[in-house]
Amino acid sequence: DEDGHWRILGDPTEGAFLVAAAKLCDNALDMQGFERLAELPFDSDRKLMSVVLREQASGRLLLLTKGAPDVLLQRSARVQLGDAEIALDETHRQRFQSEVDAMSDAALRTLAVAWRTLTPEQAQQPDLALEQQLTLAGVVGIIDPPRPEARQAIRQAHQAGIRVIMITGDHPRTALRIAVDLGIVPADARVLTGPE
């Protein structure tokens, strides 16, 4: 916070998460009560990353995971609603997916957040198998607008007879909305995903 305005230093996605957390909760940025034990770095194949933390006051061990909403939705068994954790049933899955779709249709980049408690043995030898049976905490929509010069560059490419193709790791609906807004494709264009 600088003169009443947020200023992000470093990775914009991490900065957006920190700003959102600070706006939602007064002590969200106070990580002094947690010790970071390990990190499972982002991998484009699994589309997520995790950290293992120890809450110093209680000794509780946590795995915190963020990544593609569709991946975390598949890996979650529970959902956090306020202070309560409940089974992630089909109604909650559909509600979550509707939120992701609405954010994606608004050209927002979406990331989901989930967590789980670990045993001491799991925390000492963290591996990718721990990123299962998670508790889904929510989804975040991040504005990641194209650079101002992108629209003009695309227009010039089209005028020169160059076919413009957009390749991105974004949610397909986000990618389509951005491509339409930039004049790359019409609104009824087909989006190909990685597996396709």
Listing of model-derived features with the role each one plays in the protein:
Residues 1-136, 142, 155-156, 168-184:
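Cytosolic catalytic regions of ATP/NTP-dependent phosphoryl-transfer enzymes
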Residues 42, 145-147, 196:
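A short acidic, often aromatic-flanked loop/helix-cap motif at beta-alpha or helix-coil junctions
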Residues 114, 195-196:
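Residues at the C-termini of beta-strands that transition into short coil/loop
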Residues 140-141, 193:
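Short acidic-hydrophobic, aromatic-tinged amphipathic segments that line or gate anion-handling sites
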Residues 142-162:
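Short, acidic loop-to-helix structural element flanking the phosphoryl-transfer center
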Residues 165:
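Short beta-strand/loop motif that positions the catalytic acidic residue
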Residues 186-195:
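Conserved RecA-like helicase motor-core motifs
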